[in-house]
């Protein structure tokens, strides 16, 4: 059934829709299956994403038609399709009337992903009007809170050197805490790897007090504050809260140094919102494990990593992993810096839409996945700043001297870039950074040809 007469209006102007402030606008890359017209398929897509079904129904009235989602722009050659969703379509909380992300996902990326006349459709951007921004939680804390704890300026406080305890699984409580202490002697921030929680060989209630003791000893030894991001991911709301409450009890007077990590993609928006609302005083660390199933450029359905990050800010993530923009081991490109810009700035041009955040707190870009001191200068140069958290597991524990030396090499790498220094020349005066060349020789050979001769290192 051709529904284009009802669910498409190509006379609508995007600037008028934005000015009106009554719609969420969503841009997709959509291709219909062979034999289906582009506008017909697009209209069916909008119908399935809002008020429609596959036949006319007698219960439809004029009000229903007033909240139809409308296709307002198509370009078949580029596969561009844009749809305007009236705000009235979206579910609101009974308790406080606020928007919920699950409703946005249910409509804008729900049944339309399995339609028989659609070859593929992927969300690449969305626009949220001011009223909608006001109705989402947004972050309660941001990187400025961490800078304050670390004794830094709360504006442009700079790079936070972090790690992931490695190996990701298999360490028992004492070795785990020892690994944390070794890194904290040189670094700032440690996170649980996403599978780490309450394994039988490393029970949470045994390992966490040891981690806190390691933090206190490292703080005493260095005179510097330390940060720990604990995984509270669980299937059940009460289990999440039980883990979080126990951690707050253990850390006691140092609870401000405790962040809560949630696997927001596999756990879903409900997990993120639970952490945001139950623990607004803690830094909310959004890990995105599994996201590549839909965000990968090779996937033609779902949504992009940009969309995921933008949604995380609405939900209230204090920080989210954004990959390494082609400088680490994970899939990505240098142009992915737009992801960081969108979540950290108060206004930003996305792939399609210019988004204003109207004072909503920023979400920190968290950089992770194959990074080390040699790769960081190029990363910072591409991004244009160093106000990020970097969790370098192998880049710390793979350092030839020690995890502490690995952490120091990361800090030195940031200082090298900040000073605009030549990395080889900088290494001659900074031992830990210099030893990173020997620790990661394949990267050194690729990034800095001739480094062995210049640094006096031989095979």
Curated annotation (Swiss-Prot):
Molecular functions (GO terms): magnesium ion binding; monooxygenase activity; ribulose-bisphosphate carboxylase activity
Site location (Transition state stabilizer): 329
CDD domains registered for this protein in UniProt: RuBisCO_large_II
Residues noted as binding substrate in the record, renumbered to the chain: 111, 168, 288, 321, 368
Catalytic activity: 2 (2R)-3-phosphoglycerate + 2 H(+) = D-ribulose 1,5-bisphosphate + CO2 + H2O; D-ribulose 1,5-bisphosphate + O2 = 2-phosphoglycolate + (2R)-3-phosphoglycerate + 2 H(+)
InterPro entries referenced in this protein's UniProt entry, alphabetically: RuBisCO (IPR033966), RuBisCo_large_chain_AS (IPR020878), RuBisCO_lsu_C (IPR000685), RuBisCO_lsu_C_sf (IPR036376), RuBisCO_lsu_fd_N (IPR017443), RuBisCO_lsu_N_sf (IPR036422), RuBisCO_lsuII (IPR020871)
Known cofactor(s): Mg(2+)
Keyword Metal-binding: yes
Gene3D superfamilies: Ribulose bisphosphate carboxylase, large subunit, C-terminal domain (3.20.20.110), RuBisCO large subunit, N-terminal domain (3.30.70.150)
EC annotation from Swiss-Prot or TrEMBL: 4.1.1.39
A Pfam family the protein falls into: RuBisCO_large_N
Alphabetical list of SUPFAM superfamilies matching this protein: RuBisCo, C-terminal domain (SSF51649), RuBisCO, large subunit, small (N-terminal) domain (SSF54966)
Keyword set, alphabetical order: Calvin cycle, Carbon dioxide fixation, Lyase, Magnesium, Metal-binding, Monooxygenase, Oxidoreductase
Binding residues for Mg(2+): 191, 193-194
Family label: Belongs to the RuBisCO large chain family. Type II subfamily.
PANTHER family xref list: RIBULOSE BISPHOSPHATE CARBOXYLASE, RIBULOSE BISPHOSPHATE CARBOXYLASE LARGE CHAIN
Quaternary assembly: The complex is approximately 350 kDa when isolated from either T.denitrificans or R.sphaeroides, suggesting a homohexamer or homooctamer structure.
Record's protein name: Ribulose bisphosphate carboxylase
Species this protein is from: Thiobacillus denitrificans (strain ATCC 25259 / T1)
């Amino acid at each position: 059934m051709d529904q284009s007469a009802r669910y498409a209006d190509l006379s609508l102007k995007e600037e008028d829709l934005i000015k009106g402030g009554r719609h969420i606008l969503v841009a997709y890359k959509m291709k219909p299956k062979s034999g289906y017209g582009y506008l017909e398929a697009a209209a069916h897509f909008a119908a399935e994403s809002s008020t429609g079904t596959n036949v006319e129904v007698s219960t439809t009235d004029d009000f229903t038609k007033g909240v139809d989602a409308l296709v307002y722009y198509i370009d078949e050659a580029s596969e561009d399709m844009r749809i305007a969703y009236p705000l009235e379509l979206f579910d609101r909380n009974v308790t406080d009337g606020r928007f919920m992300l699950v409703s946005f996902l249910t409509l804008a990326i729900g049944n339309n992903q399995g339609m028989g006349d659609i070859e593929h459709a992927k969300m690449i951007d969305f626009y949220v009007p001011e009223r909608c921004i006001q109705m989402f939680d947004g972050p309660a804390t941001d990187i400025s809170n961490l800078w304050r704890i670390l004794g830094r300026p709360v504006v442009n406080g700079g790079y936070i050197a972090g790690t992931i305890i490695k190996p990701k699984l298999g360490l028992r409580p004492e070795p785990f805490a020892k690994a944390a202490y070794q890194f904290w002697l040189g670094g700032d921030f440690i996170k649980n790897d996403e599978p780490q929680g309450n394994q039988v060989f490393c029970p949470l209630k045994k390992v966490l007090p040891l981690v806190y003791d390691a933090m206190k000893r490292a703080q005493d030894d260095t005179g510097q504050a330390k940060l720990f991001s604990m995984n509270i991911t669980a299937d059940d709301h009460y289990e999440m809260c039980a883990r979080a409450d126990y951690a707050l009890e253990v850390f006691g007077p140092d609870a401000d140094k405790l962040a809560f990590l949630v696997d927001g993609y596999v756990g879903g928006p409900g997990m993120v919102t639970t952490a945001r609302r139950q623990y607004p005083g803690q830094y909310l660390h959004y890990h995105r494990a599994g996201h590549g199933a839909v965000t990968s450029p090779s996937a033609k359905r779902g949504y992009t990593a940009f969309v995921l990050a933008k949604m995380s800010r609405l939900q209230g993530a204090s920080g989210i992993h954004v990959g390494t923009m082609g400088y680490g081991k994970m899939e990505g490109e240098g142009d992915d810096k737009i992801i960081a810009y969108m979540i950290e700035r108060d206004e930003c041009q996305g792939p399609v839409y210019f988004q204003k955040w109207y004072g909503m707190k920023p979400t920190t870009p968290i950089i992770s996945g194959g990074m080390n001191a040699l790769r960081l200068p190029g990363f910072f140069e591409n991004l244009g700043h160093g106000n990020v958290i970097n969790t370098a597991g192998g880049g710390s524990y793979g350092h030839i001297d020690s995890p502490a030396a690995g952490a120091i090499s990361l800090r030195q790498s940031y200082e090298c870039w900040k000073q605009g220094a030549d990395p080889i020349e900088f290494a001659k005066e900074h031992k830990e950074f210099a030893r990173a060349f020997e620790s990661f020789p394949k990267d050194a050979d690729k990034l800095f040809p001739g480094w062995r001769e210049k640094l006096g290192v031989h095979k």
